[in-house]
Amino acid sequence: MKILPLAPPVALAIALVLTAAFAADAAAQPRKPPTPEAKEAKSAECAALGELPKAWDGQAFAIDGQTLGGTGLKAHLRIWGIQAPELRDTTRVENVPGMRARAFLADLLAKADHKVKCRPARFDRECRIVAQCSVGDGGDLGGSMIAGGMAYGFELAEALPWESRAGQRYADAEFEARKARRGLWPAWLGDQ
């Protein structure tokens, strides 16, 4: 039996299908939990950051829909009380919901000339500073992300010493955004 050579477009299509299948299989593999050594290294990394700052204000930029970078910061800021879509999936490819959330946060920052004031609450497991942040006019970034339908409430039972009702305020904003199907809620609710 003679094997005929494939036409270049057919060979390319087969190669792409096989590559995608192997990439999807690799991405579906569960991640191994961190080893005790890795946890210890991460703990040492967080300790190297020093004490939690009392406050921070300065120029900030959006890294993703829930994380800020800023001038003079030793660690990134994770906005308290929200969870936005991940910017990149397990294959490190940016996805549309994550890009929309980051763009929305970037627009909020741009309207305030990137001037941000933050009140840190704690470090998270990734050594980011979890903080409630507001822009120049006093607008709460986390609340604005939730009200715009670009994030939902996350760990809202954690009480902030300076605003005990922040969690309830965020939950109310999420309810209204969901009811009005703002931002990403149509996709999250399966309408699209």
Per-region residue spans from a language model:
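Small beta-barrel nucleic-acid-binding modules, primarily SNase/OB-fold domains
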Residues: 2-3, 23-192
